Amino acid sequence: MNSIEFPLLDRTTQNSVISTTLNDLSNWSRLSSLWPLLYGTSCCFIEFASLIGSRFDFDRYGLVPRSSPRQADLILTAGTVTMKMAPSLVRLYEQMPEPKYVIAMGACTITGGMFSTDSYSTVRGVDKLIPVDVYLPGCPPKPEAVIDAITKLRKKISREIYEDRIRSQQGDRCFTTNHKFCLVRSTRTGNYNQGLLYQPPSTSEIPPETFFNYKGSLSSHELVN
């Protein structure tokens, strides 16, 4: 279940010498020592807490939970993300050192879940804010599913090329690193109503009305994030 293949390693050399590329060596060193930053806001996070116990023992995967984003290379988002929380989540992601990874855990994180039906303040998918590497659906996902997602992420790390990853991250983000909403088409109700909105340097200084730039009165189904 937890086996990782390294097809580019040459173990046939004599005198116990392993020849490989610098990229593969870097991937191998990172996939077995992921340090997650746990960003839990709802019931999905309770399921992740079960992994800490002896039944699942996630320490065997090299996972060491960190409380500082500057010490983490994996952020695991679990639960509903609101527009008011969006700047804080993006700021945490930006403070993580490269290379960094994201696991979106649960229906509320991936699509907004049932809370986004008539809500004007719920983010309909955390991938609109930060690039997601692994989607973990469920309401909530079981601890076994979390382990499977971590295993799939490790396999992805073992095969990735760092330069390609950086290019894809720069092109797929809707909420950019300079805190600006991009004008993209909504998959639900048409075009977004927000213009290009800039935020102050400190998230504590962001007024609530920053995220809501409505022109005239809008019905509830037109309020999209």
Curated annotation (Swiss-Prot):
GO terms for molecular function, please? 4 iron, 4 sulfur cluster binding; iron ion binding; NADH dehydrogenase (ubiquinone) activity; quinone binding
Q: How does it sit in the membrane?
A: Peripheral membrane protein
GO terms for biological process, alphabetical: aerobic respiration; electron transport coupled proton transport; photosynthesis, light reaction
Q: What is its main location?
A: plastid
- In which domain of life is the source organism classified? Eukaryota
Q: Which cofactors is this protein said to need?
A: [4Fe-4S] cluster
Please give the InterPro entries that the UniProt record associates with this protein. NADH_UbQ_OxRdtase-like_20kDa, NADH_UQ_OxRdtase_20Kd_su
- Protein keywords: 4Fe-4S, Chloroplast, Iron, Iron-sulfur, Membrane, Metal-binding, NAD, NADP, Plastid, Plastoquinone, Quinone, Thylakoid, Translocase, Transport
Q: In the record's cofactor note, how is the cofactor described as bound?
A: Binds 1 [4Fe-4S] cluster.
Record field: catalytic activity: a plastoquinone + NADH + (n+1) H(+)(in) = a plastoquinol + NAD(+) + n H(+)(out); a plastoquinone + NADPH + (n+1) H(+)(in) = a plastoquinol + NADP(+) + n H(+)(out)
Q: Where, by residue number, does [4Fe-4S] cluster bind?
A: C43, C44, C108, C139
Membrane as a keyword of this entry, yes or no, is yes
Judged by the first EC level, this protein's enzyme class is: translocase
- Plastid found in the keyword field: yes
Where does this protein reside within or beyond the cell? Plastid, Chloroplast thylakoid membrane
Q: Which SUPFAM superfamilies match?
A: HydA/Nqo6-like
EC number assigned by the record: 7.1.1.-
Q: What are the annotated GO cellular component locations?
A: chloroplast thylakoid membrane; respiratory chain complex I
Function recorded in the entry: NDH shuttles electrons from NAD(P)H:plastoquinone, via FMN and iron-sulfur (Fe-S) centers, to quinones in the photosynthetic chain and possibly in a chloroplast respiratory chain. The immediate electron acceptor for the enzyme in this species is believed to be plastoquinone. Couples the redox reaction to proton translocation, and thus conserves the redox energy in a proton gradient.
- UniProt-listed PANTHER family: NADH DEHYDROGENASE, NADH DEHYDROGENASE [UBIQUINONE] IRON-SULFUR PROTEIN 7, MITOCHONDRIAL
Name the family the entry cites.
Belongs to the complex I 20 kDa subunit family.
Subunit (UniProt): NDH is composed of at least 16 different subunits, 5 of which are encoded in the nucleus.
Q: What is this protein called?
A: NAD(P)H-quinone oxidoreductase subunit K, chloroplastic
